[in-house]
Amino acid sequence: MIQNGGNSYVDSNMNETQNDTTDNFDAEMQDLNGYISEIVDEARNVSEVDAKFLGDTSALQAEGLWSDEESDYEGSDDESNFSKTASRTEDDIANEEWEENLKAVAGFRKVRKGHKGRGRVSRADMLPSVEVQQMLSLANHLFAQEGNFDEAQKLAEEIVRIDNNVIAAWKMLGECHRQRGNGRVNIEKCLIAWMAAAHLKPKDHELWFTCAKLSESLEFWDQADYCYNRAVSAKPPNKSELKKYIWNRSVLNKEHGSLKKAAEGFKFLLQSSPYNASILKNLAEIYIKIHAPREILKQFEIAWKYFYQYPAPPIGNDIFDLPTLNLYAELLLLDHQWSNLIRLINRGVRWFRGRKSESFWDEFDDDREWDVDERRREFPNASEEHTNKEAYLLPHLFRTKLGIARLKTGELPEAELHFSVIKNLPPDYAWGMLYDIAKAYMDIERLDLALEYFVLICNHEPAQNIGLWYNMGVCYLELKEYEHAQQCMEAILIVDNSNTNALIKLAEINELQDNRDAALEIVTNIFEQRRNINELEREQSQNEDHEKNVGSQLFVGNQKVPQDKWEKRARISRSKEEARQFTIWKTEETQRRFHKLDILRQSLKKEENVSESLNEWLAIASELIDEFVSIKAFFPSEKKARARAGLLTRRTRYASLNDQLTSMINRLNDSLTRTKYGDLDLDTILRTGYFRNVSIDAWYQLFVEFSLRLTKVGSVQQAYDVLTTAMGAILFDQDTIKRQNLRWCMLACSMYARDPQGALTPLRWVFTTFQFRQDTYRLFSAVLSQGYECSRAFVDSANQKFLLRLIKLMDQLMSNSLVSGAATLVKNDDGLATVPTSYDPVLVLLYGHIMARNRSWIPAINYYSRAFAINPDCPITNLSLGLAYLHRAMQRLSDNRHYQILQGFTFLYRYYDLRVNEGLGEKQEALYNLGKAYHFIGLEHYAVKYYEAVLGLSPMSQGDKMTSSESTVSTTYDFGFEAAYNLRLIYICSGNIKLAFQISSKYLIF
């Protein structure tokens, strides 16, 4: 049977013409009618005991291909009608027609029989001839009572030959074929007959559903989808049946690639069952495949909130179980919602472990709750149950995702604790998780660690594939292990000798190893290979339009070979004249590209075709920078050469594959020319200040502008690479201003991209270059002052060590004695160093802030005290010292708590005295901080007085008669909103709802 084609058996019978019914019956025929009626009456009384004649249908029942309703033809509507009409004589029919005609003559509207106001009678609803009715009754008797399926089948075939619109005959014919066994041929013939019956009665949704299940069993997927569509369009009155049909159709579509249609079906079901986990699972799997997690995240969030309100996971079907939670976590992982993912895994798995009430774990910034080492779970309010391993067992899939989330937020030590558990699992079980970890390390460019996990995966032979070898080759290439990288790419080419990506990487490896002839040959072969492919495609589809793939992809193979006018130079001549001509062309081409950049820059300023102009600008700039970086003379030292090689192996995503190949072939041509006839005259370039008739300043501006534009389009890591490479170029390194501005540009890029981890490198350079200058410490605090991620970068362990070494250097210089672990004093460009003449309170205070952020209150108090001793009249020092004492007093293991609170308020009131005389804004700030301090230790009745004083100075109190504009602070620095909110919380906790409502109405509702 052909899956999607026509049905020859059905078509041949459909084309049969219906025989004319006999007009007159003689007495013998009337006797036969009576005999057949008796047979039908007996058949109707057949009990369920006679089911043995129907054969063994258990196998079909298990497959969902048999139901009692389908086989109970003696009680069907069609047969019932035929049985009733079989006992009616022609005279009765004629009398009824005569009466109807009389009514019509008398002016009454003629009754339409059996249609209840509907249109014309369909072929299937027309009564068959009496001859057909008699044959059908006899076939029923043979099938049901005698179990003579062969004779019943012959009669059914004869009925179909006489009148192919009899549904019951088609159904019986299909049933006869099915009773012959579960063989494929029998089921196919059964399906043919039932499909014909279903088309005769398109509203029979149950029959369409049966045909769909049979089609699925025969792997006729398109036909099964068609039958499900017809069952749904039949609009069954029972909503549960409609949902069943849509569910089966959606599952079928999902399993066979029609993901969009499957998603539409599941979304329809989700409207009536928003918390059904089975529907959510299927939708999650679909959107994970098409990389569109955001389409379903909202529905998962709604369902999660609904189930999470229970103290423990409910029991039943279609509930939010651990696999559903894992899919929810996978969606958050794909959408890069790292903080939400961490929170979901911690709370979700805790809920499934029966520990929902242990919310105190959320107070910790790490994942000690799931540590294999039980000692990290020990803390002051821990109970004996915290040593129960099963209650604190984190499933491996969740541990992998949690580790990746920690890795992406810059918490490398915490991530490694999770990965160490996965790393010790057998590779045949954990290779999928190991691969995800390795890819995560590649994303943050820790290729050494990524390679470590890729090597582990190689121990499991079934996991080895082209993707694994390619990623390993990229890691080896970035780590400058060219021999291993070449082996990986050659392994790919053994399996797939036309793999473009492996060939390109192999060419890059040869280029970096100065084997330019081999690299040029590989690139030329790629051009030839792609030209042959394109010519073959043009021959096969001359009239088809081919989509142009703009932008680079990981594996691209559909782009046309560029018709570059210098493509002919793939095998350049070695003559001096041609080398000179090539150099002239490169110079002219470079100037042309710079001119094109100027034109595009003007277009960007006018905001004309911004997207197209920007992509073109980035592509041209990328080619120019590649051209600059390919000059080895510009990167003499080994460190600078590594930066150059690193940029050469990273191609911007704005350059297409064709552009990459063209750029590479031009570089190789240029390099081969210089190799044979001498490299560029670096002294001449430095003396004249021009390279390819373009000033060094213009090249410098290109690097800076390119990095800034990359940052604006979201490629901040590539911007860092470009700037790092520029820092290694000798043309820029000799100029102090250019060298410093490149660092400032990197800091600007990190600030624009809100990348605090990226800002740490230029900030440490600022500390080193401008030692013992207070503005550097203020800049550090200002850059890392926004949000949670900045806060984590602020307390980075490397920063702590760096600042501690600076403090030790300051102590060493001030005491004239050697201090172990001190930093090195850096000299300025004039050869002199900045030596402090006194202790710097800002540096000590900054380190105290880092200790306080880590909740290390005793070290924080020590450094705050040093800052206080240096400058006792600094308000921020007094405030910080007072708060540190209060926080230390509130810790569980604190000794002499009341004395520490007294010390804390001593410094806080000193801060108040220093601040209150500086102005109304400063006074309001001091009042608010005192109120917050009392609120923090639980003395709320004292806090109320200070909060009310803050509100008295707020511009929001202008309605009061006692308040004038001269006695209020500026709205820019007003603390009234914060004070009102805290005051409202106090009133609510104390049960004074009336006052809380008054505060909200006056200060919090706008």
Swiss-Prot record:
Post-translational modifications: Phosphorylated.
Start-end of each TPR repeat: 133-166, 205-238, 277-310, 396-429, 431-464, 466-499, 841-874, 924-957
Q: Name one GO cellular component term.
A: transcription factor TFIIIC complex
Annotated GO biological process: transcription by RNA polymerase III; transcription initiation at RNA polymerase III promoter
Which molecular function GO terms apply here?
DNA binding; RNA polymerase III general transcription initiation factor activity
Compartments where located = Nucleus
Task: Output the PANTHER family linked to this UniProt entry.
Answer: GENERAL TRANSCRIPTION FACTOR 3C POLYPEPTIDE 3, TRANSCRIPTION INITIATION FACTOR IIIC TFIIIC , POLYPEPTIDE 3-RELATED
Q: How does it assemble?
A: Component of the TFIIIC complex including sfc1, sfc3, sfc4, sfc6 and sfc7. The subunits are organized in two globular domains, tauA and tauB, connected by a proteolysis-sensitive and flexible linker. Interacts with sfc1, sfc3 and sfc6.
What is its biological role? Answer: TFIIIC mediates tRNA and 5S RNA gene activation by binding to intragenic promoter elements. Upstream of the transcription start site, TFIIIC assembles the initiation complex TFIIIB-TFIIIC-tDNA, which is sufficient for RNA polymerase III recruitment and function. Part of the tauA domain of TFIIIC that binds boxA DNA promoter sites of tRNA and similar genes. Sfc4 is the TFIIIB assembling subunit of TFIIIC.
> What's this protein's name?
Transcription factor tau subunit sfc4
Species this protein is from: Schizosaccharomyces pombe (strain 972 / ATCC 24843)
